[in-house]
């Protein structure tokens, strides 16, 4: 029988994959009231990132500031899904957004995002989860799994 007392197991993955909607994961170290006023949007131009942003709309609308986080310039993203396009779209809607592009190797993505979240005093992250096949995630690991194991800030994920 698997151990389900921590998020360091299969339960969060199964919840995310089968919930049919967004899941707000709150790290065990989180204390205080949940009032996300500074939101980090992990953006790679994917369908999952767009869906996560759409699912976070109630939080985004109430935020004091948003920061779009892209890794390595979101390599290979078409212009219509770029971080610049996202920033312009949200700014047109009157939302207070900035962007940060960070460079990281595949194995450092999750720690780099969490470090940036701390630097920017982010109250919540928004991201897609498990965007690669189960085989790919199983063989190479994944940002989602690493994030679930080490998150330091509440994170809204969508699959």
Question: Model-found features: residue ranges?
Answer:
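Intrinsically disordered or low-complexity boundary/linker segments at protein termini
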Residues: 1-69, 150-159
